[in-house]
């Protein structure tokens, strides 16, 4: 058996896992910051997908109004923290992402025909990897979110005109929100 990283490959096999590590790592850092900062997630008729659906909040997009008064004042409130666990759980347990972060973050396996760090692979039958099997349940939750995201994309197509009426229009934000649903 080959030791970790040993291979007869001549190509730069390590580039893709390193770039994936940087990309996924940057996304995790950014999304964590975006979820906890709890501000600047709306602009006019646009609502950030990280905050959709906004259940409670101080914007006009909030479905149930302002944050509940029973929340402790010392607890930082962000509308994203109420909902991000569902699409995040779907993405984290998704087969594609599992393959990407297994290779890039755990180097298991690092690439095809490259030595692995361990030789006693147990698959996803033991804790904690058996938790990956909740993917099928997160799918149903993620599908519910598509309706809210589509609704937000539709709302993003209507802009307040100078006459005070709503007018149909398409901006860059509208295109991004619509592409997110598709």
List each language-model region with its residue ranges.
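Membrane-embedded alpha-helical bundles that constitute the cytochrome b-like, heme-associated redox core
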Residues: 1-182
């Amino acid at each position: 058996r080959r030791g970790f990283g040993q291979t007869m490959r001549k190509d730069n096999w390590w580039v893709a896992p390193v770039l994936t590590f940087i990309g996924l790592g940057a996304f995790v850092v950014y999304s964590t910051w975006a979820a906890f900062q709890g501000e600047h997630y709306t602009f006019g008729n646009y609502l950030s997908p990280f905050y959709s659906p906004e259940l409670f909040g101080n914007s006009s997009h909030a479905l149930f109004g302002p944050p509940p008064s029973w929340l402790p004042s010392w607890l930082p409130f962000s509308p994203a923290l109420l909902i991000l666990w569902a699409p995040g759980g779907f993405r984290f347990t998704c087969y594609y992402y599992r393959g990407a972060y297994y290779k890039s973050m755990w180097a298991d396996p690092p690439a095809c025909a490259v030595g692995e760090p361990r030789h006693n692979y147990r698959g996803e039958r033991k804790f904690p990897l058996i938790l990956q099997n909740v993917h099928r349940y997160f799918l149903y939750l993620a599908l519910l979110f598509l309706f809210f995201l589509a609704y937000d994309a539709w709302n993003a197509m209507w802009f307040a005109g100078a006459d005070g009426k709503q007018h149909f229009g398409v901006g860059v934000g509208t295109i991004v929100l619509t592409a997110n649903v598709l």
